[in-house]
Amino acid sequence: RVNVMVDFNGDGRTGYDFVVSSTNGINDAVITNESRFNKDWDGSWQHAVSEDAAGWSVEILIPWYTAPMHAAKDGQRTLGIYLDRVTGSSGERDAWPVASFMRPRFLSEFQRIEVPQYHQSLFAITPYAPGLYDNVRGRSHFQHGADILWKPNGQFPLTAALNADFGQVESDDLVVNFGAPETYVSDKRPFFTENQGIFDFSLLDDNSQLVYTRRVGGPSDDGHGAADI
């Protein structure tokens, strides 16, 4: 597989990982706090894989609206780049630059390159209309809503959810917890994974969040009112 990691601001604070395997499998993640990977993020990008007798190659298209970024200076943008190739049979990893996510400093060690400033906008509406039919009572129940995403440029993204369908994402892993503290569950809902890294902060050797978005939309512990976030 190959990994393409990009720090769009070049400041070592937030990076984005794009992974493509030889079997056309993909993965992506947000990188914060030097080496913390949040795989709940699903970015908008494209890829293609080609294989022949000489080997295999991959092509990746990452639109400029994929991630938020600061305004460029003097028409030039500084990017942080990290590229590597992993051979599964031997576990060998060839990387440029020489950096490792196992070290204390990883994201800030990306290679800095200068590219011209580009502007690319995005406006997307994802509607939904699920239905439910009760065979016992003979009743039907329908809902409707939409996710709206507007990015006129890299500095101003607007995300909205109208009657969000929180059942459209993958189910959580089953965890049996007999302790007093609740089990931490990451958020996979698209509305909350967009720019989620802005709520992360480092406290000693722990990664914490200012807002626990999984409680949004849920009831409080006593069943009265909304849950604390």
Provide a role label for each language-model segment:
Residues R1-I229:
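Structural preference for beta-rich elements and adjacent junctions enriched in aromatics
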